[in-house]
């Protein structure tokens, strides 16, 4: 009853990585937040597949994952994110949202985002999902460069900003700082 779960996931390497978190609410009043960041390079495949099962009343869940991908055409960087949220018939008062955003940095990258939401009752507070897969925004890049910021630094700033929504929600400062450092290391590969 009234349990709180904060799950943080970060993937920055590995040829094939699969992470499969599961949340199963068994008593009312639970609150779960699942946060994730990933940065895939050539030849890497990352899969995040989660299930949030709302089976009791008055629980809340929020899922937010963000990833960036850069790869070569011959050796793609690939990611797959599947977010399953189930709101069962006796889970009145549920409030849930899931989001996955992917930033494609090169032509040799592919991201699949599959949010699934199954609702068996109409008596909920809220439920929704969103997923995006998009290329780097040249308009933002142009704006920063018009302000005198060199192109490589402007790219790094935009990508850091993309991940900040997740990183700033992590309450453990040492963990959020480590993630910022790992992202900086990945960004150095881009400008190299």
What role is predicted for each listed range?
Residues 1-149, 163, 170, 174-192:
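Conserved beta-strand/loop scaffold segments within soluble protein domains that form the structured core
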């Amino acid at each position: 009853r009234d349990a709180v779960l904060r799950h943080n996931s970060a993937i920055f390497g590995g040829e094939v990585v699969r992470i499969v978190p599961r949340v199963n609410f068994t008593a009312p009043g639970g609150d779960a937040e699942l946060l994730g960041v990933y940065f895939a390079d050539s030849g890497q495949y990352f899969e995040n597949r989660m299930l949030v099962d709302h089976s009791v009343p008055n629980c809340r869940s929020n899922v937010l994952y963000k990833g960036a991908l850069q790869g070569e055409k011959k050796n793609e960087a690939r990611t797959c994110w599947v977010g399953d949220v189930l709101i069962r018939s006796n889970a009145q008062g549920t409030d849930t949202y899931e989001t996955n955003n992917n930033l494609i940095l090169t032509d040799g990258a592919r991201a699949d985002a599959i949010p699934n939401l199954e609702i068996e009752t109409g008596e909920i507070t809220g439920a929704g999902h969103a997923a995006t897969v998009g290329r780097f925004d040249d308009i933002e890049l142009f704006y920063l460069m018009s302000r005198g910021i060199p192109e490589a630094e402007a790219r790094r700033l935009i990508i850091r900003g993309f991940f900040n929504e997740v990183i700033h929600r992590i309450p453990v400062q040492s963990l959020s700082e480590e993630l910022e450092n790992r992202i900086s290391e990945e960004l150095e590969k881009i400008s190299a």
